[in-house]
């Protein structure tokens, strides 16, 4: 018994003697970890600011010489039209692809009048139909061209925020077919030539809806999340061939799709957004944690940083905030539709 008492006394002594040391080590580890966390967050934020406001992007000339070709899908309106105009101004010939032939003709005339040395080709095709013959026509149109740039801009969203269970089947099909299949099939036509030439730019329009789950825009959000993953994987595949792949993470822009007409600090017009995008190619902007991706417009970049680096973009809280916002938008849209219907019937 005395032997056990001696052991107990010894153990008690060890606990008494070593506990303060362990507390000191624990405190030091926590201090170092906390300091590292703060420093890394500050460093990341400084990288974001530098990328958004200081560092220039890659020159378009690095993807192909003046006189080579750029393909712009969804080219007849909004961002697509602005991409076509600004790339034409840089001296690239343009292939315009969109649904409405009359709008493509008007844009062709505008480009020709502003930039007489720039050649244009156009193809009217409805991406929602996903016809093999349309893609064969596009393949034939570009097969002998030095395509240096592809702007995957074609896209479709919901007409108004809508619960998934109430989404019309044709709207579901159109969103997936246009946003996903259309982008993939056009890109697949362009990649072999770029790989052979060992240069090129594939720029795909993404959305914050692909970063943050967007209730009442579930199908659109899912399609953009798909493009986010696909583009990142493609970027890794094509980097060894000298091809730059970039997905542009965009918030709201004044356009027919967003149905927003008034600009603000958070909502630029297409001209300002495209200018920022083309001047920041290769920079992550506000998306430092996303490879082969960028949020180049300054205010969008800051919001993207908050959503992805400060807040968990997949959190239930953020999804619920989006849900509340879209429910409010839906209510206003339905009330507006009711008023318009009442006017028509009166």
Swiss-Prot record:
It holds the Pfam family adh_short. CDD domains: 17beta-HSD1_like_SDR_c. It is found in: Endoplasmic reticulum membrane. One of its GO terms (molecular function) is very-long-chain 3-oxoacyl-CoA reductase activity. Pathway: Lipid metabolism; fatty acid biosynthesis. PROSITE patterns: ADH_SHORT (PS00061). It comes from the Eukaryota. The keyword Ion transport does not apply. The active site is at residues 220, 224. NADP(+) binds at residues 71, 126, 134, 153, 220, 224, 253, 255. Keywords: Endoplasmic reticulum, Fatty acid biosynthesis, Fatty acid metabolism, Lipid biosynthesis, Lipid metabolism, Membrane, NADP, Oxidoreductase, Transmembrane, Transmembrane helix. It catalyses: a very-long-chain (3R)-3-hydroxyacyl-CoA + NADP(+) = a very-long-chain 3-oxoacyl-CoA + NADPH + H(+). SUPFAM superfamilies: NAD(P)-binding Rossmann-fold domains (SSF51735). It is a single-pass membrane protein. GO terms for biological process: fatty acid elongation; secondary metabolite biosynthetic process; sphingolipid biosynthetic process; very long-chain fatty acid biosynthetic process. Its main location: endoplasmic reticulum. Belongs to the short-chain dehydrogenases/reductases (SDR) family. Component of the microsomal membrane bound fatty acid elongation system, which produces the 26-carbon very long-chain fatty acids (VLCFA) from palmitate. Catalyzes the reduction of the 3-ketoacyl-CoA intermediate that is formed in each cycle of fatty acid elongation. VLCFAs serve as precursors for ceramide and sphingolipids. This is Very-long-chain 3-oxoacyl-CoA reductase. It comes from Emericella nidulans (strain FGSC A4 / ATCC 38163 / CBS 112.46 / NRRL 194 / M139).
């Amino acid at each position: 018994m005395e032997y056990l008492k001696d052991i107990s006394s010894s153990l008690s002594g060890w606990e008494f003697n070593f506990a303060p040391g362990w507390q000191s080590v624990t405190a030091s580890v926590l201090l170092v970890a906390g300091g590292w966390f703060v420093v890394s967050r500050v460093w990341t934020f400084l990288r974001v600011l530098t990328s958004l406001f200081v560092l220039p992007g890659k020159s378009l000339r690095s993807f192909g010489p003046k006189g080579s070709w750029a393909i712009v899908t969804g080219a007849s309106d909004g961002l697509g039209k602005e991409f076509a105009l600004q790339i034409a101004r840089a001296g690239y010939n343009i292939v315009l692809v969109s649904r409405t032939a009359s709008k493509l003709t008007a844009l062709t005339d505008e480009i020709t009048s502003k930039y007489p040395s720039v050649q244009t080709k156009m193809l009217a095709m409805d991406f929602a139909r996903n016809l093999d013959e349309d893609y064969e026509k596009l393949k034939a149109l570009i097969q002998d061209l030095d395509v240096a740039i592809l702007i995957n801009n074609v896209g479709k969203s919901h007409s108004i925020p809508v619960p998934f269970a109430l989404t019309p089947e044709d709207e579901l099909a159109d969103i997936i077919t246009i946003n996903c299949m259309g982008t993939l099939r056009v890109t697949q036509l362009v990649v072999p030539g770029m790989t052979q030439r060992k240069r090129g730019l594939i720029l795909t329009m993404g959305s914050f809806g692909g970063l943050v789950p967007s209730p009442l825009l579930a199908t659109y959000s899912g399609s953009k999340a798909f493009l986010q993953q696909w583009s990142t994987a493609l970027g890794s595949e094509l980097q060894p061939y000298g091809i730059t792949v970039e997905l542009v993470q965009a918030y709201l822009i004044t356009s027919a799709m967003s149905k927003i007409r008034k600009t603000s600090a958070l909502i630029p017009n297409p001209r300002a957004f495209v200018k920022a995008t083309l001047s920041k190619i290769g920079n992550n902007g506000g998306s430092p944690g996303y490879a082969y991706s960028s949020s180049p417009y300054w205010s969008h970049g800051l919001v993207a940083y908050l959503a992805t680096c400060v807040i968990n973009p997949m959190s239930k809280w953020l999804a619920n905030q989006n849900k509340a916002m879209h429910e409010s938008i839906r209510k206003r849209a339905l009330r507006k539709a009711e008023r318009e219907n009442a006017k028509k019937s009166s």
